[in-house]
Amino acid sequence: MSGVPPAAALLGAAGLIPFAAGALAAHGLMPGISNPVTGLLILQGYGAAILAFMGGCLWGFAAQAGRTGWREFAVSVAPGLWAFAVTFSPDALLSLIIGFVFLLALDLMFRGWGLGPVWWIRLRLPLTVGVLICLSVGKFA
């Protein structure tokens, strides 16, 4: 993650801890969590919260750049609305996987529009891969 501010890299990586804990717990491998369903609920709840949070980051990029049109703001609310819509669906983890792939596409779109820091994709790509691995591990528990 060269060029990424150390604080963003470290805190971003720390944000993967609940995903990893949920994935391990879903397989009964997390000390102190005896019910694998708890791991799935951790992944669902935390995954939805982070997906919505990341949409808020995109909103912030548009606002910081002084954008006033609909395009950037409308696109930035999509991850949060998706997270809300799928949180309690029967296949929430698959839906969150789709949501995080879509979010990465939005990250790339915003960079193409010149929004967000130049290092954003270098941060987001490895974190998204980590999230997708953890959600997939939980999905196939």
Predicted regions and their residues:
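Short juxtamembrane and helix-loop transition motifs at transmembrane-helix boundaries
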Residues: 32-39, 53-66, 89, 108-116
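Transmembrane helix-loop-helix
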Residues: 86-102
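Interfacial loop-to-transmembrane junctions
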Residues: 105, 109-131
